[in-house]
Each structure stands twice: as structure tokens, then as C-alpha cells.
């Protein structure tokens, strides 16, 4: 009986994965944080605003449940699903 109970506990722990959550870089501080439960996708969103010529592209890093869809054609979104895979872009 104890063996059956122990087996059930182990199977439950393996199936629940002990509440693992993805880690992604988050802006504005560009630091690694745990994503909220259910958000397993990291994303990097880049776009130009009115100051793009003097300051460069804007960058937004974060977590999402699914890869966000760009609302405008000049917005670029890259998604990934490994811990801290959405590093700040390197500009040429």
C-alpha cells in the first residue's frame, strides 16, 4: 500500500512539474524574470516611433501565452520558447 501511495505521489509531481514557469527578459529594465503561469513564450518586439531617426528602434521584451501578432506592418515580433531566449537585439 505504501509503495502504491509513493508511486502516485511521484507521478503527480512529475506531471505537475512543480509549477515550472518560463524565464524571459522583461523591459524596461531588461532583466530576467519568471513569467506568469500559462505564459510560456518569450518575445522581442521592435518598431520605429517618431524618434527612430535619432534614438533608434523601440524594443519591448516580455512573456506571452502565444506569440503576439503585430498590429502594424512595421512592427517586428520574434518569439521563442526557451528560458531567456529573448535577448536585447544587437544593432549593426
UniProtKB/Swiss-Prot annotation:
Superkingdom of the organism of origin: Eukaryota
Record's keyword terms, sorted: Acetylcholine receptor inhibiting toxin, Disulfide bond, Ion channel impairing toxin, Neurotoxin, Postsynaptic neurotoxin, Secreted, Signal, Toxin
Name of this chain's protein: Long neurotoxin 1
Similarity section: Belongs to the three-finger toxin family. Long-chain subfamily. Type II alpha-neurotoxin sub-subfamily.
Pfam families the UniProt entry points to: Toxin_cobra-type
PROSITE patterns (alphabetical): SNAKE_TOXIN
Organism from which the protein derives: Oxyuranus microlepidotus
Function of the molecule: Binds with high affinity to muscular (alpha-1/CHRNA1) and neuronal (alpha-7/CHRNA7) nicotinic acetylcholine receptor (nAChR) and inhibits acetylcholine from binding to the receptor, thereby impairing neuromuscular and neuronal transmission.
InterPro entries given in the database record: Snake_3FTx, Snake_toxin-like_sf, Snake_toxin_con_site, Toxin_cobra-type
Coiled-coil blocks: none
Residues spanning the signal sequence: 1-21
Presence of keyword Magnesium: no
Disulphides: 24-42, 35-63, 48-52, 67-79, 80-85
Lineage of source species: Eukaryota, Metazoa, Chordata, Craniata, Vertebrata
An example Gene Ontology CC term for this record: extracellular region
Tissue-level expression: Expressed by the venom gland.
GO MF term set: acetylcholine receptor inhibitor activity; ion channel regulator activity; toxin activity
Subcellular location: Secreted
Signal found in the keyword field: yes
Amino acid at each position: 500500500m505504501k509503495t502504491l501511495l509513493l508511486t502516485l505521489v511521484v507521478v503527480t509531481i512529475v506531471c505537475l512539474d512543480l509549477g515550472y514557469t518560463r524565464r524571459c527578459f522583461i523591459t524596461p529594465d531588461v532583466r530576467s524574470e519568471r513569467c506568469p503561469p500559462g505564459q510560456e513564450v518569450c518575445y522581442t518586439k521592435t518598431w520605429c516611433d517618431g524618434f527612430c531617426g535619432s534614438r533608434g528602434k523601440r524594443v519591448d521584451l516580455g512573456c506571452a501565452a502565444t506569440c503576439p501578432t503585430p498590429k502594424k506592418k512595421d512592427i517586428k515580433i520574434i518569439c521563442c520558447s526557451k528560458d531567456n531566449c529573448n535577448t536585447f537585439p544587437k544593432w549593426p
